[in-house]
A protein has these predicted regions:
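Short, flexible hinge/linker loops that cap or flank conserved catalytic cores
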Residues: 6-8, 160, 297-299
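C-terminal helical "tail/cap" subdomain of flavin- and related membrane-associated enzymes
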Residues: 2-12, 76, 86-88, 94, ...
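Short beta-strand element of Class I
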Residues: 38
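Conserved FAD-binding catalytic core of PHBH/FMO-like flavoproteins
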Residues: 69, 88, 106, 111-116, ...
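Short, solvent-exposed loop/turn segments at secondary-structure boundaries
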Residues: 50-53, 248-253, 317-321
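Conserved mid-domain beta->alpha element of the FAD-binding
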Residues: 15-33, 41, 167-168, 282-372
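Active-site-adjacent segment of FAD-dependent monooxygenases/related oxidoreductases
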Residues: 50-128
Length: 430
C-alpha cells in the first residue's frame, strides 16, 4: 500500500513596507518562520530614524525580550530616573510639582520604563534582521491586487514584486493604508512638536531641571518636555499650536530654526527658559502632528495588513507607538503561523489578526475620547491660567488609564486561539 505524502506548501512571500520599529520587528518575527520568504522595502537610502527620544514602556520591553532585540540594548543607551519614579507633571510657568508617577510594584526591574534616542532602538532591532533581505531607496508608488489574489508592487525606480502578503509598516501617512482604505483621511491637528537633543552635562548644570521625564505644562496645548537620555544626550521637546492655513506641514522631521519661536516660551519658569535657550542653539527638527479616525479594520483584500502607526493614526498620543507596533507584529505573525499549521488560507490568518487588534484600538481611541471630553469641559469653565493648569493635570491624573502599558499581547493571542488552536470570539484583553 502506497501512502501519498502531502504536497509541501508553497513558501509565503511577504513584503514589509517601512523600516521603522514595526517593520524591523516584522522582519525579525517573519524571519523565524521558515516557510516565509520576506523582503523589507524602505524608501530612504538607509534604515535610519529621525527625532529625539522614545519611551520604552513595560510592554515594549517585554516584546523586545520576546523577539530577542532586548539583548542589543545596553544600560548606557537609556535613562531611568535614579529615584525610581516614572515621570513628573509640573506647572511650566512656576515650576511647581503637580504630580509624580511611580512604577507598579510588580514591575520587573528590567522592564521599568525608560527613555532613549530613537535611533538606538532602531539599531538594536536592526542587529537581529537579515539585512540581505532589506532593500533601501525603494519608494512604493503602486499597489495592484491581481485576480489570483497576489499583490503586485511597483516602485519609483521601476522595480516590481508580486507577493502573497503586503504588510504596511509605513507610518502615520501610510501609502498602503491609502490604497486599502482610500476614504480614510488624516489631517494636521494644529500642533507641531520641536525636538532637540542637547548636551546632557550642560543641561544638568541648570538649577531646577529634575533628573526625570518632566512635562512642563501650560495652557493652549503648549508644553515643554525634558528628559535625560542615554550617554551625554538630553532631550528637549516643545509642543505648540501653529497656523493651519498657509503652511506646508509634514509629519517627518525636518530641520527647523528653533530660535525663531523660542520667545514664545518666555512665560515659562527660568529653568525651562534656559533649556529652551540651549535648544535654540542646537539642531532642531520640526514634526507636524497628524491624526485620523479609528480604522474599523486593519486588513484589506485578504492580502494586506497594517501595523504600527499605519494601523492606528494616534499621533503619539500614548507615547508607546513602538510597543503598539510590536504588539501588532506579534499578533500578525502568530495568526499567520496558526493558519499555516491548521491548513487555513491567508484570509483566515488576517481575519484572526483583525479580530485580535481592532478591539484593542477601539479601546485606545475610547481613552482619547474621554480626554477630549475632559478638556472641553475644562475650557468651558474659563478658569484663571494657574488654576487651569493645575486642574488639567489633576483631572487627567484622576482619569488616566495605564492598562495599555501592561497589556500582554501574548496572553491575548493565546486566549483567542484557545487551548485547541481554534479561533474564538473575544474582546480586547486588558
Amino acid at each position: 500500500m502506497t501512502i501519498k505524502s502531502r504536497p509541501t506548501p508553497k513558501p509565503l512571500k511577504v513584503a514589509i513596507i517601512g523600516g521603522g520599529p514595526g517593520g524591523l520587528g516584522a522582519a525579525i518575527e517573519f524571519g523565524k518562520l521558515d516557510y516565509v520568504d520576506w523582503t523589507l522595502y524602505e524608501k530612504k537610502p538607509q534604515i535610519s530614524e529621525t527625532g529625539g527620544g522614545i519611551s520604552l514602556q513595560r510592554h515594549t520591553w517585554r516584546l523586545l525580550e520576546l523577539n530577542g532585540a532586548a539583548k542589543n540594548i545596553h544600560p548606557d543607551d537609556f535613562f531611568r530616573s535614579p529615584d525610581g519614579t516614572s515621570g513628573q507633571q509640573r506647572n511650566g510657568r512656576t515650576g511647581k510639582l503637580l504630580e509624580q508617577s511611580s512604577h507598579p510594584a510588580d514591575t520587573p526591574p528590567q522592564q521599568l520604563s525608560c527613555r532613549m534616542v530613537r535611533a538606538k532602538l532602531q539599531a538594536a532591532l536592526l542587529q537581529d534582521v537579515d539585512q540581505s533581505r532589506v532593500k533601501t531607496s525603494k519608494k512604493l508608488t503602486s499597489i495592484l491586487v491581481l485576480p489570483n489574489g497576489k499583490v503586485e508592487l511597483s516602485f519609483e525606480d521601476g522595480f516590481t514584486d508580486d507577493v502573497d502578503l503586503l504588510v504596511g509598516a509605513d507610518g502615520i501617512r501610510s501609502f498602503v493604508r491609502s490604497f486599502a482604505f482610500p476614504s480614510h483621511k488624516i489631517k494636521y491637528n494644529g500642533q507641531s512638536a520641536y525636538r532637540t537633543i542637547i548636551h546632557r552635562p550642560t543641561a544638568e548644570k541648570i538649577d531646577g531641571i529634575p533628573q526625570s521625564p518632566v512635562f512642563w505644562q501650560n495652557t493652549g496645548g503648549k508644553y515643554v518636555f525634558t528628559c535625560p537620555l542615554g550617554g551625554d544626550d538630553f532631550e528637549v521637546t516643545a509642543r505648540i499650536r501653529r497656523p493651519i492655513e498657509g503652511q506646508h506641514h509634514v509629519s517627518w522631521g525636518r530641520p527647523f530654526d528653533f530660535s525663531t519661536i523660542a520667545p514664545e516660551y518666555d512665560e515659562f519658569c527660568e529653568p525651562v527658559r534656559k533649556v529652551i535657550q540651549l535648544a535654540a542653539q542646537g539642531e532642531t527638527q520640526e514634526f507636524a502632528l497628524f491624526s485620523g479616525p479609528r480604522l474599523e479594520s486593519v486588513i484589506s483584500h485578504g492580502a494586506l495588513a497594517l501595523i504600527g502607526d499605519a494601523s492606528h493614526p494616534l499621533s503619539g498620543a500614548f507615547g508607546a507607538g513602538a510597543g503598539f507596533a510590536l504588539e501588532d507584529v506579534y499578533a500578525l505573525t502568530r495568526s499567520v503561523d496558526w493558519a499555516r499549521r491548521n491548513a487555513e488560507g491567508l484570509p483566515a490568518a488576517l481575519g484572526l489578526y483583525d479580530q485580535i487588534r481592532s478591539p484593542h484600538y477601539r479601546d485606545l481611541y475610547g481613552v482619547l475620547d474621554n480626554f477630549a471630553a475632559l478638556n472641553s469641559a475644562l475650557l468651558a469653565e474659563k478658569l484663571p491660567v494657574e488654576e487651569e493648569i493645575e486642574e488639567r493635570v489633576r483631572r487627567a491624573g484622576e482619569s488616566r488609564s495605564t492598562w495599555m502599558y501592561h497589556y500582554e499581547i501574548e496572553k491575548a493571542v493565546d486566549k483567542f486561539l484557545g487551548a485547541t488552536g481554534e479561533p474564538g470570539q473575544v474582546a480586547s484583553v486588558l
